[in-house]
Curated annotation (Swiss-Prot):
It comes from Paraburkholderia xenovorans (strain LB400). It holds the Pfam family ABC_tran. Part of the ABC transporter complex PhnCDE involved in phosphonates import. Responsible for energy coupling to the transport system. This is Phosphonates import ATP-binding protein PhnC. It is found in: Cell inner membrane. PANTHER family: AMINO ACID IMPORT ATP-BINDING PROTEIN, PHOSPHONATES IMPORT ATP-BINDING PROTEIN PHNC.
Length: 301
C-alpha cells in the first residue's frame, strides 16, 4: 500500500452562511503527516469554521470541493460522507470549550477516547477494560495531571482541562489533532504547558497538529509553518519565522493590530474554568523546512 502523502487535503472549499456572508472562499490546502501548523487570523477570519469543516461537523457549499483525511474523503461537494464517524476516529479535538463532561471523572473523560474500539455493551455500561484504564492513567501522567484522575472534570482549571483533552487524544490513538484556540483565556504558564504538550504529541508521538491561534508569537515559537486567513481567504502560507510586524501589516492592514497586540501582550492573566457539560491560502507548502513561500498577491498591496 502506498504511503499517505497528506494528512489533510482540501480542494476548493467554500462556505456561505445564511446571511450571505462568505466565511470560507476557495480554500486549497495540503498538510503532510507529522507537521505542526498554526492557523492565524483576526476574529471572524474563518479559523474555527475551517476546522469544523475539516472535522466533518459542518458541510461546505454545494459546489465541487473535497476534504480528505489521511487519504479518505470526509466531505465532497457540500455533503459529509456516511463514513464520517469512522474517519473521525483518527482525529483528536481540542476546543476552547474544553469538551469535557463536568459531572464525570477526569479518567472517564479521557477513556471516552477509547469508546470507538470497544464492544457496544461496554459502551453502554461504561465498563472499560483494565488495559484501557491503564492507558488512560498513563496518558494523564504524560500530560502532567495524573493526580487528578479521580476528580470531577468540573474541578479542573482551564489549562488542566485542555491537557485532559490532549490525554483523551492519546487514548483515542488519534493521528491528527485539531486544536481551536486551545490557549484562549489561559494564563501564560497554563498556555505554555498546553502548547508544550501539543509539541510533544507532534514530535514524540508523531501526530499531525493543526492549531488555531490569535498570538503570532506563539505560532512562531511552536509551529514551523503558519497559514494565515483573512476574511475566509488564505493570504499567507509559509515559514512562521517570516511573520514580521511589517508582513502582518501588509497582509491584514489595520486588522494586524489584533494579532500584533495580542502577540505583545500574551494570553489573559486569568485562567478560565469550564461550566458547561455540552460540546460545543493558497496551496500549502511542504513540511520539514522545504517551504514554497506563498503570499497571495491579492493581499500584498
Amino acid at each position: 500500500m502506498d504511503a499517505i502523502r497528506e494528512a489533510i487535503r482540501i480542494e476548493r472549499l467554500s462556505k456561505t452562511f445564511s446571511n450571505g456572508r462568505k466565511a470560507l472562499d476557495e480554500i486549497d490546502l495540503r498538510i503532510e503527516p507529522g507537521e505542526m501548523v498554526a492557523l492565524i487570523g483576526a476574529s471572524g477570519s474563518g479559523k474555527s469554521t475551517l476546522l469544523r469543516h475539516i472535522a466533518g461537523f459542518t458541510a461546505s457549499d454545494a459546489q465541487p470541493s473535497q476534504i480528505e483525511i489521511l487519504g479518505r474523503p470526509i466531505q465532497q461537494n457540500g455533503r459529509i460522507v456516511r463514513e464520517v464517524r469512522s474517519i473521525r476516529r483518527d482525529i483528536g479535538f481540542v476546543f476552547q470549550q474544553f469538551n469535557l463532561v463536568n459531572r464525570l471523572s477526569v479518567e472517564t473523560n479521557v477513556l471516552i477516547g477509547a469508546l470507538a474500539r470497544l464492544p457496544w455493551w461496554r459502551r453502554l455500561s461504561g465498563r472499560f477494560p483494565r488495559a484501557e484504564r491503564a492507558l488512560s492513567i498513563a496518558a494523564l501522567n504524560e500530560v502532567g495531571i495524573g493526580e487528578h484522575a479521580r476528580e470531577r472534570a468540573a474541578n479542573l482549571s482551564g489549562g488542566q482541562q485542555q491537557r485532559a483533552a490532549l490525554a483523551r487524544a492519546l487514548v483515542q490513538r488519534a493521528r491528527i489533532v485539531l486544536a481551536d484556540e486551545p490557549i484562549a483565556s489561559l494564563d501564560p504558564e497554563s498556555s505554555r504547558r498546553v502548547m508544550d504538550m501539543l509539541r510533544t504529541l507532534n514530535i514524540e508521538h508523531r501526530l499531525t497538529v493543526l492549531v488555531s491561534l490569535h498570538q503570532v508569537e506563539i505560532a512562531m515559537q511552536y509551529c514551523p509553518r503558519t497559514i494565515a486567513l483573512r476574511r475566509g481567504k488564505v493570504v499567507y502560507d509559509g515559514p512562521s519565522a517570516a511573520l514580521t510586524p511589517a508582513l502582518l501589516k501588509t497582509l491584514y492592514g489595520d486588522e494586524a493590530r489584533e494579532l500584533i497586540d495580542e502577540a505583545a501582550q500574551g494570553p489573559d492573566d486569568t485562567e478560565s474554568k469550564n461550566t458547561a457539560d455540552n460540546t460545543p491560502l493558497q496551496d500549502a507548502a511542504p513540511a520539514s523546512g522545504r517551504y514554497a513561500f506563498a503570499l497571495n498577491p491579492a493581499h500584498s498591496n
